[in-house]
């Protein structure tokens, strides 16, 4: 995390305009991704019979209702984070165990859908951005994912990083790269959020799913134990170990998704 802060400070000194624009892109993507995640929990809970989130004003796109300061900071610097959990009352569920599982997975499902939708839009944009010769050359080499997968050190990586001039000569509609950058970031952040929330650590969604689906609600930790686990988990996040592991998983999944959507380019 601290190396990320140092990099941002250095970039502000060497390229202040570009760094500020990047931070604005990141802020928009973080807000949207976290809000969608939490609203999905509340909406599914409402459909399952629990109106708590709606009654407390959490079924809204207002970021002030959702953002957690520490989770947002982690999202900016670590690309993984969290928002304020949507309040639910499982006692209102029509089918306690089934509905608890559905609500737990709702945020993850919403982020995965946003990732896939963003990649679909990015694929359409790639068809509009790059010259036909470039697309044909990549197709012949079996490398069309280079236009979508930010982990490939390729066209998508450059667009994601805002380095438009590097391949500007190969673009027929260069200004669309600014639009595609937003959707590539949305794809990466939503995938990262989905994978991160699958971790079986309280208070993440993966823990709630594990508790209900595997242990049938028997993981009754006391508040002190939960607090200790969360503190240890934060230290693991800040150490960078978890970030490297999640990047490996995200890269693998992004490769699969990119291969699928590259077929329409």
Question: Which residues are covered by each model-predicted region?
Answer:
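Hydrophobic transmembrane alpha-helices and their immediate loop junctions
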Residues: 1-265
């Amino acid at each position: 995390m601290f190396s990320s802060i140092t990099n941002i400070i250095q970039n502000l000194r060497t390229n202040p305009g570009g760094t500020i624009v990047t931070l604005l892109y990141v802020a928009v993507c973080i807000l949207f991704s976290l809000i969608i995640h939490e609203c999905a929990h509340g909406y599914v809970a409402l459909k399952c019979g629990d109106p708590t989130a709606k009654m407390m004003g959490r079924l809204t796109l207002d970021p002030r209702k959702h953002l957690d300061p520490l989770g947002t900071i982690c999202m900016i610097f670590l690309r993984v984070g969290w928002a304020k959990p949507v309040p639910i009352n499982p006692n209102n569920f029509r089918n306690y165990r089934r509905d608890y599982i559905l609500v737990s997975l709702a945020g993850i499902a919403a982020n995965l859908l946003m990732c896939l939708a963003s990649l679909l839009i990015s694929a359409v944009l790639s068809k509009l951005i790059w010259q036909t010769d470039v697309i044909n050359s990549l197709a012949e080499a079996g490398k069309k994912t280079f236009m979508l997968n930010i982990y490939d050190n390729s066209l998508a990586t450059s667009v994601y990083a805002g380095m438009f001039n590097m391949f500007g000569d190969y673009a027929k509609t260069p200004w669309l790269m600014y639009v595609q950058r937003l959707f590539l970031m949305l794809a990466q952040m939503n995938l990262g959020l989905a994978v991160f929330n699958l971790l079986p650590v309280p208070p993440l969604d993966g823990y709630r799913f594990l508790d209900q689906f595997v242990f049938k609600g028997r993981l009754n930790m006391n508040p002190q134990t939960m607090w200790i686990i969360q503190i240890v988990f934060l230290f693991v996040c800040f150490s960078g170990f978890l970030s490297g592991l999640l990047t490996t998983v995200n890269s693998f999944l992004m490769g699969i998704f990119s291969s699928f959507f590259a077929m329409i380019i």
